[in-house]
Amino acid sequence: MNTVRNNETRYIILELLAIAFLATGGILVKISALSPINTGFYRVLFSLPLLFPIAYKHLKQLSKRDTVILLLAGIFLAGDISLWNLSFHYTSVANANLLTNLTTFTVIPFSYLIFKERIPKFFLAGAAITIAGVFILITGKTDTNGSSLFGDFLALCASLFYAGFLLISYRLRNRISSSVIMFVSGFGSVITLLITASLVEGLQVPHGASQLWPLLGLTLFLQVIGHNLLAHCQGKVTVNLSSVICLSQPAIASIYSFFIFSENLSAIEVLGIIIIMAGVYLVKAQYNLKSIKVCNITEDS
């Protein structure tokens, strides 16, 4: 059976909204009083009871194989969360957002090999324009120094883990709701993060509202709303376009900085944002020319 993903405008808007929620992550991670991996652990842990009422009635549709695949996806997401959170202690929020979202270079070849998605004639041109815009944006925000290189490396590694999660959840989204994907994969994430936090940082317990609210913000904005909404859009938007839209996250984070912290955007930053949006528009225009059929992979029972 084939699933048609024709990239309707409403789902493009919903995915941009998901990215807007995800763009709050860097600010909340830096505010958190807990260590980075512990912060990620509580982000996922607190999300499970919130997702359960939504996912419960759909859990029966899962096979044992589906459950194992989702737990594996959760391990990839845990790797992304851990490395992403750690990167904020070494590099800027803008750089971390940029490098973590460079999943395009991983996702595009694998989507072609696994899902048989054809790459439109001008898709790579649109992606290149978007990436150029992101780099132009970053040049106006980042203070380059030697210590930031390690943080950049962590964020880049996080992008590989996120690409793994994106591909695995995309594969199952043809049959399984996004709430089930986030709920079941959350168990894989929380177990992985618990073990990693205990070994690397020592398990920490938040005390008081001042330590809890950043964790709850991460849970609600990222784990429940952001990733859940993004997973939902993956059922309606091709994975290539989805990966390019994710590159708008640094632009949205820059806008947050302008309104929340009164950080003025330079002319170069504004130019970068405009170029990013132009690249995304070019990619969407190509997909509007022809609906893309994504072949489901036949799985053994």
Where are these regions (language model features)?
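Loop-to-transmembrane-helix transition segments
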Residues: 10-20, 42, 60-84, 150-158, ...
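Juxtamembrane C-cap of transmembrane helices in multi-pass membrane transport proteins
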Residues: 18-34, 82-91, 99, 165-176, ...
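Glycine-/small-residue-enriched transmembrane alpha-helix faces in small-molecule transporters
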Residues: 1-41, 75, 83, 145-171, ...
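C-terminal-most transmembrane helix of multi-pass membrane proteins
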Residues: 2-4, 43-44, 139-140, 211, ...
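C-terminal transmembrane-helix exit sites in multi-pass transporters
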Residues: 53-60, 103-128, 251-271
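Hydrophobic transmembrane alpha-helices of multi-pass small-molecule transport proteins
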Residues: 51, 71-73, 77, 122-141, ...
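Helix-helix packing/entry segments at the starts of transmembrane helices
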Residues: 96-102, 169-190, 223-259
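Hydrophobic alpha-helical transmembrane segments of multi-pass integral membrane proteins
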Residues: 9-15, 37-53, 122-129, 150-154, ...
